[in-house]
Amino acid sequence: DWFYGQVKAFAGSSYQLMSDARTHWDRKASAEHDRIAGAFVGLSMGDALGAPVEFCRRGGFPEVTGYRAGGKFDLPAGAWTDDTAMALCLAQSLIAMDGFDAEDLLQRFSGWLEHGENTSTGVSVGVGQNTLRTLGGFRRNGTLIAERFGSKNEGNGSLMRLAPVVCCYYNDLQKVREMASAQSRTTHASDIADECCQYLAGLMARVIGGQSYENARSELQEAEWGYPLMAVIENNHKAAAESEVKSSGYVVDTLNAAIWAVENSQSFEGAVLKAVNLGDDADTVGAVAGQIAGAIYGYSSVPKHLKAGLVDERKLYVTSQFLTI
């Protein structure tokens, strides 16, 4: 379609052309562009690092120190899962529709699920139950807002894909929260997931916009939030032992674990590795930590080996820059 036609024209088919394109962006890009790329590509790096140990018990696998093959989905090293695929769908929709459009977004999610669009291997993997049910409802009757299903609606599927919204709307703190909520509601009928998305969007938007991470956290702590999220916000993450950190698919656990990993490290790589080595829902904890750490440290701080080993890294980088146009 036109979007990837534009990406191809910009990036070309060779690594050298992509290198030239990066140089072009680096010359004209601000520190904000660097943090935007860090957040978006960082999501994918955390996803790819964590994918091979997703569902693994903490301490029950060799320490993750870089990309590796295998895991439940038997992916090649550097390949990513639903976290990144859905983020690409969201980014593509925001660009093509010049803003948020629930129907277009759900159509793109359906293309990913049914036809393997926007995947790293040509096959969709890792879809969550909330998303699966919602897309079923969308295909059957065009439902654009997720409906509650039993008691399990508080998954992390809308949090993991959030970065594109922040990349688009970081300079409007009210709108970035509104759009974070809107994209969450397409697949998750959960006030808790909604609020976690709003919080993370506000945090990342402030950091991308130039605030320090500490100031952004302090400013957001003064706002009113519901109990499960407020407990995360008020938690002393630097003092928390790893044994106290849950890395489950519950959205509050995921956000808490990602913040813990970021606040107990001093670099992008350190944050995402600390996150994925928690195990359990490792790819999504890694993806959320990657978004936060990428926004803090920027794309330029990411080690070359993490860029070189990531499947479709060129497309991910360029997509992040199209979100800023």
Predicted regions and their residues:
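Structured, active/binding-site neighborhoods that engage oxygen-rich ligands
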Residues: 1-325
